Amino acid sequence: MRVKRGNVARKRRKKILKLAKGFRGAGSKLFRTANQQVMKALRSAYRDRRRKKRDFRRLWIARINAATRAQGLRYSEFIDGLKKGNIQLNRKMLARLAFLDPEAFTQVVEAARQARAS
């Protein structure tokens, strides 16, 4: 029996061109170019969704480190003090606290310092 493809190919190409909307030049007009651009864009999006998590964690650590060094404590010592003092604040919240409410952050640093001392 003969298999008729109907409009399968057209639908597939239209789907790719729709994804390529907004790309520059031939990247949004010609199927082969658009297909390559879309595949690369999807690969980058997949990779960068994972990278974003790493990048934000690095940013939070850098901010916390800067804030703790201003108080005379290294980042590693600060985290050690938090663990020993059973203070369960994640790095995102610590970075926000250091940026938005320095007084409260100072209290957390002091609590970590005392937990390390005891």
UniProtKB/Swiss-Prot annotation:
<dbReference type="InterPro" id="IPR035566">
    <property type="entry name" value="Ribosomal_protein_bL20_C"/>
</dbReference>
<dbReference type="GO" id="GO:0003735">
    <property type="term" value="F:structural constituent of ribosome"/>
</dbReference>
<comment type="similarity">
    <text>Belongs to the bacterial ribosomal protein bL20 family.</text>
</comment>
<protein>
    <recommendedName>
        <fullName>Large ribosomal subunit protein bL20</fullName>
    </recommendedName>
</protein>
<dbReference type="GO" id="GO:0006412">
    <property type="term" value="P:translation"/>
</dbReference>
<dbReference type="GO" id="GO:0000027">
    <property type="term" value="P:ribosomal large subunit assembly"/>
</dbReference>
<dbReference type="GO" id="GO:1990904">
    <property type="term" value="C:ribonucleoprotein complex"/>
</dbReference>
<dbReference type="GO" id="GO:0019843">
    <property type="term" value="F:rRNA binding"/>
</dbReference>
<dbReference type="InterPro" id="IPR049946">
    <property type="entry name" value="RIBOSOMAL_L20_CS"/>
</dbReference>
<keyword id="KW-0689">Ribosomal protein</keyword>
<dbReference type="GO" id="GO:0005840">
    <property type="term" value="C:ribosome"/>
</dbReference>
<dbReference type="InterPro" id="IPR005813">
    <property type="entry name" value="Ribosomal_bL20"/>
</dbReference>
<keyword id="KW-0694">RNA-binding</keyword>
<keyword id="KW-0699">rRNA-binding</keyword>
<comment type="function">
    <text>Binds directly to 23S ribosomal RNA and is necessary for the in vitro assembly process of the 50S ribosomal subunit. It is not involved in the protein synthesizing functions of that subunit.</text>
</comment>
<dbReference type="Pfam" id="PF00453">
    <property type="entry name" value="Ribosomal_L20"/>
</dbReference>
<keyword id="KW-0687">Ribonucleoprotein</keyword>
